[in-house]
A protein has these predicted regions:
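Conserved helix-loop functional segments at active or binding sites
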Residues: 20-23, 27, 50, 54, ...
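Conserved ATP-binding N-box helix of the HATPase_c
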Residues: 35-58, 120-127
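Long, structured ligand/cofactor-binding scaffold of large enzymes
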Residues: 48-49, 53, 65-67, 72-75
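A conserved short beta-strand within the histidine kinase catalytic ATPase domain
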Residues: 58-64
């Protein structure tokens, strides 16, 4: 079959979505160096900022985990977990695995928007070797885990809670990024900017990596 015949709508479709993000990550996050690595954090945090702007979120907690993972927890309404009519799966799965899923949600209920590049949390998922999303909503905790953007099981209940909000824990894929070393000061600068721009929103940043502390357990400043 000729190359011309191979270039069809089907072949283009095959490169859309999560697969295309992994093949061309720089198109979505700028680059696969330090800037792109830190941009992943901004994308997740920006969803919490949207909730704050809508008057539903007052706290965002960002943690750098051992192994250069990132945890972002907010006290917003929580990503919807009900079945999405068009997709036939939980809305949480749609948000986490469909590029541009924000347009699939009613503007009055929930939207997902991105940061600088407007790509959203699904791109973070695609570029992570592991990601876990937990939603605290209406007294229950709903979870789903992913590997390189692919869901490992359907959204399920995992317990009860007296909190509300969304927690995302992700570990960037070492096959994608040149370095996995998050710089505390880069993230701190961005979080300070967001806090200044969003009055009434409390943003915290914690570095749990042992390499970031001195012998007495105090935070070391970046060089």
């Amino acid at each position: 079959m000729s190359e011309e015949k191979n270039y069809s709508a089907d072949s283009i479709q095959a490169l859309e979505g999560m697969e295309h993000v992994r093949m061309r990550p720089s198109m979505y996050i700028g680059d696969v160096g330090s800037r792109g690595l830190h941009h992943l954090v901004y994308e997740v945090v920006d969803n919490s900022i949207d909730e704050a702007l809508a008057g539903h979120c007052t706290e965002v907690n960002v943690t750098i985990l051992e192994g250069n993972g990132i945890k972002v927890m907010d006290n917003g309404r929580g990503i919807p977990v009900g079945i999405h009519k068009k997709e036939g799966v939980s809305a949480l799965q749609v948000v986490m695995t469909k590029i541009g899923a924000g347009g699939k949600f009613d503007k009055d209920s929930y939207k997902v928007s991105g940061g600088l590049h407007g790509v959203g949390v699904s791109v973070v998922n695609a570029l992570s070797i592991d990601l876990k999303a937990s939603v605290h909503k209406e007294g229950k905790i709903y979870v789903q885990e992913y590997k390189q953007g692919k869901e490992q099981y359907l959204v399920k209940e995992s317990g009860s809670t007296d909190k509300r909000g969304t927690e995302v824990i992700f570990f960037p894929d070492p096959k994608i990024f040149e370095s996995l070393d998050y710089q505390y000061e880069i993230l701190a600068t961005r979080m300070r900017e967001l806090s200044f721009l969003n009055k009434g929103l409390n943003i915290t940043l914690i570095d749990e990596r042992e390499s970031s502390k001195d012998e007495e357990g105090n935070q070391l400043a970046d060089k």
